[in-house]
Amino acid sequence: MDIVMNPDRSQWAALCQRNIPNDDAIEQSVREIMDNVKQNGDTALRDYIARFDHFTGPLAPLSEAEIAEGASKVSPEVADAIRRAADNIAKFHSAQLHPDVDIETMPGIRCVQRAVPIQRVGLYIPGGQAPLFSTVLMLAIPARIAGCAEVILATPASDEHPIAPEILFAAKLCGVGRIFRMGGAQAIAAMAFGTESVPRVHKIFAPGNRFVTKAKQLASRFTAIDMPAGPSEVLVMADESARPDFIAADLLSQAEHGPDSQAVAICSSEAQARQVCDAVARFSAMLPRSESIASSLSHSHIIVMDSIDTAIDFVNLYAPEHLIISTRNPWQVADRITAAGSVFL
């Protein structure tokens, strides 16, 4: 990671640039997959799953017995952690429920706002570098609380590597109805258009790679989607009270998502910045996805800024997906943040 010392505001735009690849090259191939699945259903879907996922098993969803068998392989410690996380997520989203708005704006004119559940939703869970069972929880639990009539889940598997037990455990815990072994653009196409084996859904929720994101964008003409997802990113805003090893761990937690991820830290001194840089190098050498992390860190930065006010201005310009505030008075800082996806104090 490079260290940038007190950059002039004229340099900020360049520091805010993301490493977003040009997806024009993949659009044609994704469009062909979408069109083929739309026209030929299971025949096309089976071909793509065999070609890309290396899975030659049935297109039918897993049976209850298969789900139970896979889920039973989760260790008691991990199972307890998943249950605890599920409880916390459910508490938060239950608090988001609100009563109808019902108001008479003038005599005889009644206006009502009412939230109704989407009937059938499709969840896509990536299965590449790590089993993202947390994504199962964060998508399936709100769907259950909202009252969606049916939740189906798609995640890739291969003949040699079945669906991770943690994903099956989380899906079973959350009451997911059907689980399909399919990944990539072909999974998005199947849920968007429906096939003989896969039902068409009314909305797709799907983090994923460039191919999944492009497929969602094309599918949005036919069914609702959550939003296009870019590469994961984090900005850690720290003052002298923050521990350099903690900052490094937070940076790497996003950098390991993929080679296009970006991790940025704002430090209060050059000494702290160099300590963070050293810790990042030390920790990354211990992690299994070192090549992907190295690619991510090649377009990441540690920025030294001389005041908290300047740092806040930069954060609001950068508008990070994930913002971690590691300062003495984090709530006071958070109150001044106007552009960030999720904020952690």
Task: For the regions a language model picked out, list residue spans one by one.
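Short acidic-hydrophobic, aromatic-tinged amphipathic segments that line or gate anion-handling sites
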Residues: 1-7, 178-183, 302-307
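N-terminal Rossmann-like NAD(P)+-binding subdomain of aldehyde/semialdehyde dehydrogenases
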Residues: 1-119
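Flexible, acidic loop-helix segments that line cofactor/substrate-binding pockets
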Residues: 61-75, 228-235, 257-273, 278-304
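Conserved small-residue-rich beta-alpha loop and adjacent elements
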Residues: 103-169
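Glycine-rich phosphate/diphosphate-binding loop of Rossmann-like nucleotide-binding domains
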Residues: 134, 145-162, 238-246, 250-288
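Conserved NAD(P)+-binding/catalytic subdomain of aldehyde/semialdehyde dehydrogenases
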Residues: 173-262
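C-terminal core of ALDH-fold dehydrogenases
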Residues: 317-345
